[in-house]
Amino acid sequence: IGEKRELKKVLEKYWAKQTDFNEVKYVAEQLKKRHWNYQKEAKIEFISSNDFSYYDNMLDTSILLGAIPKRFESLKDEELYFTMARGNETCVAMEMTKWFNTNYHYIVPEISKNTKFKLNSKKVIEEYKEALDLGIKTKINLIGAITYLGLSKSVDNSDAFLHINNVVEAYKELLKEISKLDDEIVVQFDEPLFVKDLDSKVLSLIKPVYDGLSSVASNIKI
């Protein structure tokens, strides 16, 4: 959010209709550059991209995977993003709940048996290129498929993990795009769900999911 809470302040201006989204984007770009350069100067070996968020990384992942609840389907771009998080006069916001045992709250994905996944890789690809323009090769951070589905909410009592193959296919498509960005790229899948006591069904997904993702491109290290 910035040392002086720059992101928070510009977002509040934007939500109050005191500025447009171009100023928000400008502040975000400056923060990302500053933070990447801090890490470069500190000689950090693996500097991350796609860890920045305007609001929440789980919300970013829902946008990435195209998991958009039906009530938001008429919206797009930043209006879609912030309405999913905050709601508006006609659309109820998505639920927020605690991220494990922390005081941080995330936007809970809404999944049903009819959920369709469609990759939207724009943020991931653009942030990698932004860092590369500064001479910084980043590792790309992503929330893993198992954690994403495991922390989602079923709105029709269906099993979210019925979609595991669809989510993995979206991630495979993303990895193919990522593989074209550089000769060698590190991708980090965060799976904090693995700290929990998982049932055998979920445990049985880990090997096939990551065997499949690891086989997509020889120049990607997961």
Label the predicted regions.
Residues 1-222:
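Domain-level signal for soluble alpha/beta catalytic cores
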